[in-house]
């Protein structure tokens, strides 16, 4: 899919929620997974780049997404929202279950083209952020790192924060790094360019 205009990004809907591979859609549409810590702004990212207010439900309570949520975009592409990691109020067994579900999807889904790994630009990546990035690199899954909440930092400090994030991740410069803000609508075009390059 070389041209963005062939995709009507506003024609989007939630397709289904899945707990395991028996529930995944049975076709060959390309999929982009979205991964990140609870409350990093995954739902806001989805809503913003699709130009929709409440397609992905945002929540002030982290850990709301407990299944893989598949979003259909113009019958040409899917986003797959995976459960947010690193939320302390979820039991260890529940976290292990989520981890297994995410790992099964990421390592066995032929439709998967890339993962948008969301991190918070304001802070150094967490241990879980680093583990996720390392996991994706190990399995040779293309990664698009999107650093959210840029509006909370003065623009003059973005480069410094970007350097901190990249250093902690041991960022591979062949991957894409995007500074993003759903509030100020920064990084939308760059995100689409990176996504469409993979599908």
Swiss-Prot record:
Residues 28-199 form the EngB-type G domain. PROSITE patterns: G_ENGB (PS51706). SUPFAM superfamilies: P-loop containing nucleoside triphosphate hydrolases. Keywords: Cell cycle, Cell division, GTP-binding, Magnesium, Metal-binding, Nucleotide-binding, Septation. One of its GO terms (biological process) is division septum assembly. Mg(2+) binds at residues 43, 65. Pfam families: MMR_HSR1. InterPro entries: G_ENGB_dom, GTP-bd, GTP-bd_ribosome_bio_YsxC, P-loop_NTPase, Small_GTP-bd. It comes from the Bacteria. Coiled coil: none annotated. GO terms for molecular function: GTP binding; metal ion binding. CDD domains: YihA_EngB. One of its GO terms (cellular component) is cytosol. Its cofactor is Mg(2+). GTP binds at residues 36-43, 63-67, 81-84, 148-151, 180-182. Necessary for normal cell division and for the maintenance of normal septation. PANTHER family: ENGB-TYPE G DOMAIN-CONTAINING PROTEIN, MSS1/TRME-RELATED GTP-BINDING PROTEIN. Belongs to the TRAFAC class TrmE-Era-EngA-EngB-Septin-like GTPase superfamily. EngB GTPase family. This is Probable GTP-binding protein EngB. The gene is engB.
């Amino acid at each position: 899919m070389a041209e963005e205009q062939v995709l009507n990004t506003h024609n989007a809907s939630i397709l289904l929620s899945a707990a395991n591979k028996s529930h995944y859609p049975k076709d060959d549409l390309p999929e982009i997974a979205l991964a990140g810590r609870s409350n990093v702004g995954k739902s806001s990212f989805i809503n913003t780049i699709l130009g929709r207010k409440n397609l992905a439900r945002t929540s002030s309570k982290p850990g709301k997404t407990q299944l893989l949520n598949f979003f259909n975009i113009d019958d040409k592409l899917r986003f797959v929202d995976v459960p947010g990691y690193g939320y302390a109020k979820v039991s260890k067994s529940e976290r292990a279950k989520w981890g297994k579900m995410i790992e099964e999807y990421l390592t066995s889904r032929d439709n998967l083209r890339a993962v948008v790994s969301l991190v918070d630009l304001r802070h150094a990546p967490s241990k879980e952020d680093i583990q996720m990035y390392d996991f994706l690199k190990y399995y040779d899954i293309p990664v698009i790192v999107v650093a959210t909440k840029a509006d909370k930092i003065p623009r003059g400090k973005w480069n410094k924060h970007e350097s901190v994030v990249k250093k902690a991740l041991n960022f591979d410069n062949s991957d894409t790094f995007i500074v993003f803000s759903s509030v100020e609508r920064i990084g939308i075009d760059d995100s689409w360019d990176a996504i469409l390059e993979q599908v």
